[in-house]
Swiss-Prot record:
Cellular component, GO, one term: plasma membrane
Organism in which the protein naturally occurs: Homo sapiens (Human)
Key words of the record: Disulfide bond, Endocytosis, Glycoprotein, Lectin, Membrane, Phosphoprotein, Receptor, Repeat, Signal, Transmembrane, Transmembrane helix
Protein name: Lymphocyte antigen 75
Species lineage: Eukaryota, Metazoa, Chordata, Craniata, Vertebrata
Described purpose of this protein according to its UniProt entry: Acts as an endocytic receptor to direct captured antigens from the extracellular space to a specialized antigen-processing compartment. Causes reduced proliferation of B-lymphocytes.
Length: 1722
């Protein structure tokens, strides 16, 4: 680590301290990764491998004895190219050499100079051979030193370019059979490179190594104007600390920006990331913002929307937006690009700001080293204060070094040290630039917490300091404050400047103290014992030591020593008095060991403290003499001072503590959040100065908890100022070795410390147990979420923020909070047992139960304090035993529940053991204890809310519920709810994670979306399920797609005004089981109902040793206590493996198993590198995970806990069981990918990443959003490479690859832009190739213009965003990454085959309906064009259809359906024979079939809407039989089909499908005498069958009017005719049921249930009378009558003519009919 305080850099004449110069002089490379020999401390022999086994040999530097620490805590042997490991599956000879990618345990750690590995086996030497023994005490050292093997930990080497986004190297890595333990150089890469994953042969992940280099070549860009070199790591994604370490490893630092000109340069820089880390941070406890390279922070450009003042949940790191130039505070753990910076010229002139100079000033002014200071006690605004100083021929004070800060803090404020005082720093600019009023250059800034906090766009801004610490704060210039004036004084003769010091030569004065260097190297204490009391004194001493060349590496003794070898360092006695340790300045990895003496280093680590051997080590000395008496020490609290209400302490402590554990807080927090939480209360995270203090603290904590808990404490090394050394957040100096050797692991990135509390009551009684195990501290990544403890000095009153709800005493005093329960002690009211129960119940609590030793001890101590040892208190009999999981107690009683029926129970502090073992008189009047469960996590069901039924056979029991899987039906929410009500249940409510897991385990054969019982309006808070249970658990999809969509409302449809929840079944997606919401009026599936049971299910495994099968895997639960390593061995005995969990269904099923066993169970997940990376022990890759949010990854092995989450546990802990498995679906070993493509060189800091035969460039640079249209984006890609184009995705593998890249930048973007355009009325890629593969979230888009954006989201689905709502489109655009792609192989011929409108194949012309339709709608659309839905009858036909679907890119309906109610009897809708099954194995439920682009044939509900269908039109017309129509048949209804005559009957068919009851009604509608067809003989059977085949539609199933009587079991026709002919299928296929159907395809009959299934209908009616013959007779008679009448008329006329004309005219009679003759048409 590089070294440097926040010391100033000065212009010519005012320059930096020497150690800063040394740091700049050369890159700070790490030597920790160099090879070494391993020396056995007892024998002095070195170890080496011989034929894979370890032997001892004489030490030398030959390669066969050289080892090296590599990634994941492995020891790599250079000569054999293997790693030292343990095969714990064998009982003997576990220790040997393994291939470094072996599944054996290869990690090693140090402890007190010993080396241990898996299962706590320790490396030992026995008879000259290496072995592993659990109780070994062998000491191991690095050759040529006294260092432990772990004293110099492995340091990561970070990368750039490549395809790893800055990830560190993974050493060793394997290429072509050779293991490489360092970066390598070859002609295929632009510089030394390394692999970044263990399995390079498969992953192909690599990057260019970032190592120290002199000058600014290769990876750097020079800028003469600013005298700097810049490294733009654009295509990387690291946390702030990782980025800082990466820069430091190269002798550089994270970017600091010191002027508007430099800011402009960065904004105008091409190829810079849009968002990237800068060195600005507030990581040093109790200090403000500062640059990591310690340059002054006087130029600012904060984003007003992300202010610099963090809140409780705020952030202490800063990033820059390159487009706006604005700085934003941001979570330090976010993964972002970064910029490093280092100076062009390392030569710096040095100046001395600490040399004493005697100065003369006017009366009242304070002289100091050439200047005079005046603190003016009147208050004025800044401008008036400035004017007053000018009137004194001076100026407001300017501060340029820590020497100036010391004057302010130690000399100007003797009384009121907390007063605020103006200094001469002021800003009048935008962006902010603070400048000194006296015109001197700003070389130091010293900001207070959360400062500088400059109001946005408001000037001027002025600065004050606080006298106590001298730290600065931005104020309104109108504030009235005191001020300090400063002017030059008269320097006196230098010869007399040290007149207060002894006359001997060499004494130097600093303040009121004199110092002298003795240049002879002597053992500790020979000359004097130096005490160092402050940072300022340390800086002065650094100045004294600066002349010693760092190459000589001199040391100077201090007076700090661990006299008792207990690890506690104190100042040696001086003048009979021992000063308290008030300041510490430890070096990297110090204090290293107990019993030593402390010396200060020179060189690059000037002034840093290191532990040395007091006798053998020799160093120079600095002696110190005070010119006056020792000053008084700061007053500290007294042990008997009180603690605030709700805070606790222990007798010897000077502090009060408050534990914030999971049951009492909203959430666990990372270290920074926890520290800010404490600060808001006026406290800090806990700190300690003495070993005994932390012991007592941990004993205190064990009374608060059972089990194991990690709690944040104030120890951290977050700030770059600390250079890798530890500090307490409340400024308590570090004087005690409380950090075990494991603190050295992954030292660069584990910057915060936590303490482990684990309850081991049996050990408290034994004096000889090892305290070091009890005091267990560990470093963690600071973003880990843990519980914490706040600490405040005794006697101080904490603050009470608005959001904080402090503990307050009730009417019975303050409660006792233990393990999530509140205990109230009712001492002033004595009641009998029953009265006590009722009293507690009336106050919303219960009579207390005792279920753990922690609770027992806390209650015992509490009642002893309240009422003495003998007073008895009522408690309640526990249903469960005390600590029933605890198996190590000395007493047997705890193993069994106390069961005395209705007997009563009390206890006292003195005789509690006897009291808990016997009943007593329930009428006795006693005080009592009430218990209230914490509702956040321990709420229990109210006993009166359970349903009054138990689970019947069809219902699946789980806990207090029954679940029923029903046939999926697509319904609205209310219909779905009614459906479950009809079964006597409700839609499921999900009340816990374990219930969620159980439901998820039922999902594999269910639909993609299922209703659950959650319903609410958009204007109300969701708080209850439809079964009236409280909403205590939720599992909404984290992306919550519907949250971005508007759910339409229909004013006339009440359901649409409500939102209802769905559970998502996304197959193997990690989001399977999560919830979404939609309009309640939409149709989704109901497949699962629930009801409550009176009796909670006591599901247990009848025989725990038997295997259980789920999906394709066999599982075995081992129900016995064992460690992780033992569990692995047990599984191997059964030829099984510790389980690897790779999908959400498997996870859910095993979570339920863990609950049923009520045990945490080992799984095969473990880490070899202190939780940085986890992998499965069977070698499978970790794709799916279920980490507990509250656990953090704190240990190396993993259990599946009873709550369904993964939690890390010490591998050597005993757990109550393990899960073994045997996979029945073992896939082939992962095939090594071959990337033969060579990509172009990086462009503008952005590398091209190879995948398959393409190269990709993911653009996260600034101004990437300036390209808004597809053409502009394409132009941007063309500038990168003429062959590139905007991203297209051809298949699922490529989709997954692009998703993987996007997830690296999930802090910056939510989508990758897709190059999809709208041309020629269809969507296509920008290169005009069709979308042969798609993954749209909502199916086929309905886009009809170019006004849209498309992107791949962080869950892998494609989203489309139109420009209808411009704000959403802008958000989509600004949160997208642009991606360019070069296809190194011409894919156009392969992918440019646009799907034709018509496609001939065999005897048909095929086409695709490209719109969303149901199966029935698709059938109708095909029929309207004279065609059918597609059918397939051989493999070639299947391949043809699959090719159509693949080219279309969407799932399409085909003509296959089943309508017999069983979803198993499928038919082609075109009437062709179902003679070829295109799918294999089981498929999803559903009665219609579609084909998806992956070639999968899926069963779906026919009324579900899909993305289209395949139609075909026959090219050959079908030869049809001649049909006979007769007028003796009933007339056809309007627009209806005609009746067909066959023999003596008329027949009419219908194209629709009907149930049996519908069929009967339909026939009577056609004609009142018509019935469902009856068949009397074989000819009629053939006629009806032929009629159906020639008029095929959907199915060949035809209802017959034949039914069976329930009484005599006889069969009869509906038309009443006798059954004279039947044609049943053979008995094995004829079916069961009381109704019948004709199967027209094979002309046989089948018995079916009348209520199930659908079929075609043929109606039958007898032939009517022959009306034509009758009409002919009538007509003939009419003609004869007419002819007779005519003859009579002619006769009469002739008679009159003969007789002469008559006077009487013919008149028609009123009763004569007119007869009309109808015309006849044959």
């Amino acid at each position: 680590m590089r070294t440097g305080w926040a010391t100033p850099r000065r212009p010519a004449g005012l320059l930096m301290l020497l150690f800063w110069f040394f740091d700049l002089a050369e890159p700070s490379g790490r030597a920790a990764n160099d090879p070494f020999t391993i020396v056995h401390g007892n024998t002095g022999k070195c170890i080496k491998p011989v034929y894979g086994w370890i032997v001892a040999d004489d030490c030398d530097e030959t390669e066969d004895k050289l080892w090296k620490w590599v990634s994941q805590h492995r020891l790599f042997h250079l000569h054999s190219q293997k790693c030292l490991g343990l095969d714990i599956t064998k009982s003997v000879n576990e220790l040997r050499m393994f291939s470094c990618d072996s599944s054996a345990m290869l990690w090693w750690k140090c402890e007190h100079h010993s080396l241990y590995g898996a299962a706590r086996y320790r490396l030992a030497l026995k008879d000259g051979h290496g072995t592993a023994i659990s109780n070994a005490s062998d000491v191991w050292k690095k050759g040529g030193s006294e260092e432990s093997l772990c004293d110099q930990p492995y340091h990561e080497i970070y990368t750039r370019d490549g395809n790893s986004y800055g990830r560190p190297c993974e050493f060793p890595f394997l290429i072509d059979g050779t293991w490489h333990h360092d970066c390598i150089l070859d002609e295929d890469h632009s510089g030394p490179w390394c692999a970044t994953t263990l399995n390079y042969e498969y992953d192909r992940k690599w990057g260019i190594c970032l190592k120290p280099e002199n000058g600014c070549e290769d990876n750097w860009e020079k800028n003469e104007q600013f005298g700097s070199c810049y490294q733009f790591n654009t295509q990387t994604a690291l946390s702030w600390k990782e980025a800082y370490v990466s820069c430091q490893n190269q002798g550089a630092d994270l970017l600091s920006i010191n002027s508007a000109a430099e800011l402009t340069y960065l904004k105008e820089k091409e190829g810079i990331a849009k968002i990237f880390w800068i060195g600005l941070n507030q990581l040093y406890s109790a200090r403000g913002w500062e640059w990591s390279d310690h340059k002054p922070l006087n130029f600012l450009n904060w984003d007003p929307d992300r202010p610099s003042a963090p809140t409780i949940g705020g952030s202490s790191c800063a990033r820059m937006d390159a487009e706006s130039g604005l700085w934003q505070s941001f979570s330090c753990e976010a993964q972002l690009p970064y910029v490093c910076r280092k100076p062009l010229n390392n030569t710096v002139e040095l100046t001395d700001v600490w040399t004493y100079s005697d100065t003369r000033c006017d009366a009242g002014w304070l002289p100091n080293n050439g200047f005079c200071y005046l603190l003016v006690n009147e208050s004025n605004s800044w401008d008036k204060a400035h004017a007053k100083c000018k009137a004194f021929s001076s100026d407001l004070i300017s501060i340029h070094s820590l020497a100036d800060v010391e004057v302010v803090v130690t000399k100007l404020h003797n009384e009121d040290i907390k007063e605020e005082v103006w200094i001469g720093l002021k800003n009048i600019n935008i962006p902010t630039l603070f400048q000194w009023s006296d015109g001197t250059e700003v070389t130091l800034t010293y900001w207070d917490e959360n400062e500088p906090n400059v109001p946005y766009n408001k000037t001027p801004n002025c600065v004050s300091y606080l006298g106590e610490l001298g730290q600065w704060k931005v104020q309104s210039c109108e504030e009235k404050l005191k001020y300090v004036c400063k002017r030059k004084g008269e320097k006196l003769n230098d010869a007399s400047s040290d007149k207060m010091c002894p006359p001997d030569e060499g004494w130097k004065r600093h303040g009121e103290t004199c110092y002298k260097i003795y240049e002879d190297e002597v053992p500790f204490g020979t000359n004097c014992n130096l005490t160092i009391t402050s940072r300022f004194e340390q800086e002065y001493l650094n100045d004294l030591m600066k002349k010693y060349d760092k190459s000589l590496r001199k040391y100077f003794w201090t007076g700090l020593r661990d006299v008792d070898s207990c690890g506690e360092y104190n100042w040696a006695t001086v003048g009979g008095r021992r000063r308290a340790v008030t300041f510490s300045n430890w070096n990297f990895l110090e204090p290293a060991s107990p019993g030593g003496c402390v010396a200060m280093s020179t060189g690059k680590s000037v002034g840093k403290w290191e532990v040395k051997d007091c006798r053998s080590f020799k160093a120079l000395s600095i002696c110190k003499k005070m010119s006056g008496p020792l000053g008084p020490e700061e007053a500290s609290p007294k042990p008997d001072d009180p603690c605030p209400e709700g805070w606790q302490s222990f007798p010897a402590s000077l502090s009060c503590y408050k534990v914030f554990h999971a049951e009492r807080i909203v959430r666990k927090r990372n270290w920074e959040e926890a520290e800010r939480f404490c600060q808001a209360l006026g406290a800090h995270l806990s700190s300690f100065s003495h070993v005994d203090e932390i012991k007592e603290f941990l004993h205190f904590l064990t009374d608060q908890f059972s089990g194991q808990h990690w709690l944040w404490i104030g120890l951290n090394k977050r700030s770059p100022d600390l250079q890798g050394s530890w500090q307490w957040s409340d400024r308590t100096p570090v004087s005690t070795i409380i950090m075990p050797n494991e603190f050295q692991q992954d030292y660069d990135i584990r910057d915060c410390a936590a303490v482990k509390v684990f309850h081991r009551p049996w050990r408290r009684g034994w004096h000889f147990y090892d305290d070091r195990e009890f005091i267990y501290l560990r470093p963690f990544a600071c973003d880990t979420k843990l519980e914490w403890v706040c600490q405040i000095p005794k006697g101080r009153t904490p603050k009470t923020p608005d959001w904080y709800n402090p503990d307050r005493a009730g009417i019975h005093g303050p409660p006792l909070i233990i393990e999530g329960s509140e205990y109230w002690f009712v001492a002033d009211l004595h009641l009998n047992y029953e009265e006590a129960v009722l009293y507690c119940a009336s106050n919303h609590s219960f009579l207390a139960t005792i279920t753990s030793f922690v609770g027992l001890k806390a209650i015992k101590n509490k009642i002893a304090n309240i009422s003495g040892d003998g007073q008895k208190w009522w408690i309640r009999i526990s249903e469960w035993p005390i600590d029933d999981h605890f198996t190590y107690s000395r007493y047997p009683w705890h193993r069994f529940p106390v069961t005395f029926g209705e007997e009563c129970l009390y206890m006292s502090a003195k005789t509690w053991l006897i009291d808990l073992g016997k009943p007593t008189d329930c009428s006795t009047k006693l005080p009592f204890i009430c218990e209230k469960y914490n509702v956040s996590s321990l709420e229990k069901y109210s006993p009166d809310s359970a349903a009054k039924v138990q689970c019947s056979e069809q219902w699946i029991p789980f806990q207090n519920k029954c679940f029923l899987k029903i046939k999926p039906v697509s319904l609205t929410f209310s219909q779905a709810s009614d459906t479950c009500h009809s079964y006597g249940g409700t839609l499921p409510s999900v009340l816990s994670q374990i219930e969620q897991d159980f439901i998820t385990s039922l999902l594999p054969d269910m639909e993609a979306t299922l209703w659950i019982g959650l319903r609410w309006t958009a204007y109300e808070k969701i708080n209850k399920w439809t079964d009236n249970r409280e909403l205590t658990y939720s599992n909404f999809h984290p992306l919550l797609v519907s949250g971005r969509l508007r759910i339409p409302e229909n004013f006339f449809e009440e359901e649409s005004r409500y939102h209802c929840a769905l559970i998502l079944n996304l197959q193997k997606s990690p989001f399977t089981g999560t919830w979404n919401f939609t309009s309640c009026s939409e149709r989704h599936f109901v497949s699962l109902c629930q009801k409550y049971s009176e009796v909670k299910s006591r599901q247990t495994l009848q025989n725990a040793s038997e295997t259980v099968k789920y999906l394709n895997n066999l599982y075995k639960i081992i129900p016995k206590t064992l460690t992780w390593h033992s569990a692995k061995r047990e599984c191997l005995k059964s030829n099984m493996q510790l389980v690897s969990i790779t999908d959400p269904y498997q996870q859910a099923f095993l979570s339920v198993q863990a609950l049923l066993h009520n045990s945490s169970l080992w799984i095969g997940l473990f880490s070899q590198d202190d939780e940085l990376n986890f992998g499965w022990s069977d070698g499978k890759r970790l794709h799916f995970s279920r980490w507990a949010e509250t656990n953090g990854q704190l240990e190396d092995c993993v259990v599946l806990d009873t709550d369904g989450f993964w939690k890390t546990v010490d591998c050597n802990d005993n757990q109550p069981g393990a899960i073994c498995y045997y996979s029945g679906n073992e896939t082939e070993k992962e095939v090594k990918p071959v990337d033969s493509v060579k990509c172009p060189s990086p462009v503008l800091n952005t590398p091209w990443i190879p995948f398959q035969n393409c190269c990709y460039n993911f653009i996260i640079t600034k101004n990437r959003h300036m390209a808004t249209t597809q053409d502009e984006v394409h132009t941007k890609c063309q500038k990168l490479n003429p062959k590139s184009h905007i991203l297209s995705i051809r298949d699922e593998k490529e989709n997954n690859f692009v998703l993987e890249q996007l997830l690296y930048f999930n802090y910056m973007a939510s989508w990758v832009m897709l190059g999809i355009t709208y041309r020629n009325k269809s969507l296509m890629w920008f290169d005009k190739t069709p979308l042969s593969y798609t993954h749209w979230r909502a199916g086929r888009p309905t886009i009809k213009n170019e006004k849209f954006l498309a992107g791949l989201s962080t869950d892998g689905f494609w989203d489309i965003q139109t420009f209808k709502v411009i704000e959403e489109a802008v958000y989509f655009h600004q949160h997208s990454i642009l991606a360019c792609k070069i296809e190194m192989v011409d894919y156009k011929e392969e992918y440019n085959t646009t799907l034709p409108q018509f496609m001939p194949y065999e005897d048909g012309i095929y086409s695709v309906i490209q719109k969303k339709v149901t199966w029935y709608e698709a059938l109708n659309m095909c029929s309207q064009s004279g065609g059918h839905l597609a059918s397939v009858h051989n493999q070639n036909g299947q391949l043809f259809l699959e090719d159509i679907v693949k080219r279309d890119g969407f799932p399409l309906w085909v003509g296959l359906s089943s309508h017999d109610g069983s979803e198993s009897s499928f038919e082609w809708s075109d009437g062709s024979t179902f003679d070829y099954i295109p799918w294999k194995g089981q498929t999803s439920p559903g009665n219609c079939v579609l084909l998806d682009p992956k070639g999968t044939w899926k069963h779906e509900k026919c009324n579900s809407v899909k993305d289209g269908a395949i139609c075909y039109k026959p090219t050959k017309s079908k030869k049809l039989s001649r049909l006979t129509y007769s007028s003796r048949c009933p007339a056809a209804k309007e627009n209806g089909s005609r009746w067909i005559q066959y023999k003596g009957h008329c027949y009419k068919s219908d194209q629709a499908l009907h149930s049996f009851s519908e069929a009967k009604k339909l026939c009577s509608k056609h004609d009142h005498s018509a019935t469902i067809v009856s068949i009397k003989d074989e000819d009629e059977n053939k006629f009806v069958s032929r009629l159906m085949r020639e008029n095929n539609n959907i199915t060949m199933r035809v209802w017959l009017g034949l039914s069976q009587h329930s009484v005599d079991q006889s069969w009869s026709w509906l038309d009443g005719s006798e059954v004279t002919f039947v044609k049943w299928e053979n008995k094995s296929k004829s079916g069961v049921g009381r109704c019948s159907m004709l199967i027209a395809s094979n002309e046989t009959w089948k018995k079916v249930e009348c209520e199930h299934g659908f079929g075609r209908v043929v109606c039958k009616v007898p032939l009517g009378p022959d009306y034509t013959a009758i009409a002919i007779i009538v007509a003939t008679l009419s003609i004869l009558v007419l002819m007779g009448g005519l003859i009579w008329f002619l006769f009469q006329r002739h008679r009159l003519h003969l007789a002469g004309f008559s006077s009487v005219r013919y008149a028609q009679g009123v009763n004569e009919d007119e007869i009309m003759l109808p015309s006849f048409h044959d």
